[in-house]
Amino acid sequence: MEVTKWMVHVCVFLVIGVVHSQIVTQTDLNNIADNLIVKVDVIRNYDNGNLHLIKVTFNNKASKSLSGYNWKIYFYSFFIVEPSHILSKDGLYTKPDGYTLPNVNLKLMHENGCLFSMSPTSEFIGLPHNEKREITFSAALWAISKTDFPPNWYMTANGLNARVISSTKGDFVGEFTSDKQWKRKKADKYDPYSPSVRYHRYKTTNSNVQQIVVIPTPKEITNKDHTKLLDVSGNVTIVHNGLDEEAKLITDKYNFDIGKTASTSGVNIYLFINNSISSSEGYTLSVNPSARCVTISGKTNTGVFYGVQSLLSLLSQGNNLQQMEIRDEPRYEFRGMYVDVSRNFVSKTVLEKLMDAMAMYKLNKLHLHLADDEGWRIEIQGLSELTQIGSKRCHSERDGICLIPQLGSGPDTSTSGSGFYSIQEYKDILSYAKKCHIEVIPEIDTPGHARAAIIAMEARYRKYKNTNVTKAVKYRLIDPNDTSKYLTNQLFNDNAVNPCIESTYVFIEKVVSELKAMHTDAGHPLNIYHFGGDEVAKTAWVNSTKCDQLNFNFSGDTASIRNELKNYFTQRVANITFTHGLNMAGWEDGFNAGDGMPFDISMYQNQHIYSNAWDNVWEWGEARRAYNYANAGYKVIMSHATHLYFDHPYEPDPEERGLYWATRCTDSYKTFGFQPDNLYQNIDVTVMGASISRAGICKSNTTCPLLHKPKNIAGMQGHLWSETILSEDNFYYMVFPRLLALAERAWHKASWENVIDETLQNSMRTRDWDNFAETVGKKELKRLDDIGIKYRVPPPGASNEGGEIKLNTVFPGLNIEFSKDNQIWKTGTIRDTASTVFLRTKSADGRRTSRVVQFNPATSTAWTIQLSFTTITLCSSILYICLLRH
């Protein structure tokens, strides 16, 4: 087969034959889209320190030549392609004419966001049947993971329906076999880990590993005696004193009786309210074999609910309960999980399973990111355009049909790029949350990250502008005369609502009032409205005529102008929420006045203003905001990206899903080791993996201010941004089992957190982790299996120890299988120490497996085709230069 290379910088190509016939029928387009084999390879990173080179191979297996010049191929990139040619010199916009690759006759264009296109010029040379060609082009920064290349590229031709290129639906990214591919720069210290390296990271020297009784660890356990057991396999009666829902939680899982009076012959479980307990979420649990009873008390129904969850955890180990007394209460009032359903949508069922797990592990806040640039996900009565248009991503030649494809969503609405919760579905979510004792916090991101709302309201404007101008402009979100140019971190040029027009606040008032009504109808009152506030482009609004009319006394640079307008916007939104009796929350940069300090909190009338402190990449110098905001009176939610962003990979491996702008990887151990009460103690490595210390970063109180008002640390939260979450399985994989480590730290303060000596603290933390990992592997993962959660199964470690191959996993108790041919799998001892072997870990229920890795006993440090990095080592912060999300 003849191969012709289209090279960006090389002016050599073979003319195979010029065919100028167009793609004229849908059959032609379908045939090419179904049979054009596309493969993407990273050639190298750190080209000139700022670029990576990409090779795209096209292999035409269609019966028709890919020729003519009336077609386009759309693809996705998190970074600007050919930035020196497509990006303006000031970086504020992309050139509308794109860039034609020299001597290739393909034009590259930035459409918007991460959507790009390539199209032939009139000089394009066709790609005949059964021919293969390659093009090479550059893109900004780096690509070190397969998920850096979203799937579902698609083709269009004039007047025809767009069609996904079938070969890009699945695995179309080549292997990463060189450090030039998986390192961002030469200074990058991260490599994928071999099974041998992983084995030594999993390995523990602790000879006294013990399972934790309950996760999260209770505050106090006394009178524990494993020789005194209470058998609950027979007649058991629950006496619940009006705590019907809490009693039902037990009977849903076990065939126990519910009675108004105690049984005289069997075992009794007593549930009751005890007002003497200090914490509203605190509880006591007593297992008394001699009295043949279990007693659970709480100050509130919520406290009893958590006591029941602890009992269910004990019962999962069998019918014999050890004698013990538990006195427990949470470390923080706010123990949250954030879910971005805008970038990629997840169903109500997925959220309900998530809440089941949150309840099991005593997490109590579900922060739902319902609107962003890529999608609007909640029905609002009277604003049908928000869901008719803003909830859909598709390819359309007409305005007002849908949002443009993003993040691999493809040309139609069949993928996770489209979807929304109806009013009834949202009420159902709220009702389920109430049952799980979880507060739902809705977020509508403004003033930035609002493209979905803007596009929807512009469609509404066009619909009514010729018949009812008042109705047309009522909810409009932009100033049509604003000529400001900007490009956001996510490459959008039109995503900021205008803070200087009254219709913006009419829109927000409408959304807040409708959300509040839904919460009230569901019996789940709205308490906190999250307005977003993050990542507003620096030059948004600088040329807005409407903002000029407000007569602000602007001074300084464009960032100062933006901050003044953000301040105005934030006050207006706070006033709206205050009139509805709500508290307000936002991302920390939404309140940022500059120099790490927030806007004056006295400007807000709300009882509480919550700030999510996320931006703690140590070298960036913004970790100080968390304590500065708390000292200024804000209620701070520790949301730090280096430890609590679950959209980041578990390991520094090209095979692992996720973004990596804040840290190359975040495994369960890293989240487990987070110290929210001692933020600067978490300082570990530079953006490229070199060790750093607190002393090196915290050279002054300006860089690392002290915390003077610790009571203003409201709690902590895990986060799943969904740029790479394309399925339900992706969702569970990224959240679990990291959520368990989050719950442990949010509920329980470990003794090692108070230890000043770093060596002693590390030793104590490792022992605590060993016990936690033992419990997760031998108990908790099976519980997750039982409720249908497909957590990540970690790949195994392996080591040739003096001729004996030893295997382990990060969570002890999971079975490991081996194979000589990657087809027939066995368990047991590996006898052959001379040949390469395939390895995989099984889930606790035995139904699923980890990624397959290869191990060469002869070298014991061989690199694998699917390498991994995991726990015990604190993987760390990585500069992705404000890529996609915080």
Annotate each predicted stretch with a short phrase.
Residues 856-872:
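C-terminal GPI-anchoring signal of eukaryotic secretory precursors
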Residues 288-507, 512-530, 721:
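Feature activates predominantly on carbohydrate-active enzymes
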Residues 149-330, 584-596, 605, 788-789, ...:
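Acidic, contiguous N-terminal accessory segments
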Residues 38-65:
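Short beta-strand elements of extracellular/lumenal beta-sandwich folds
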Residues 488, 492-608, 616-621:
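Active-site neighborhood of glycoside hydrolase catalytic domains
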Residues 583-803:
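Flexible, acidic glycine-rich loops studded with aromatic residues
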Residues 89-144:
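Intrinsically disordered, low-complexity Pro/Gly/Ser/Thr-rich segments with frequent PxxP/GP/PP motifs
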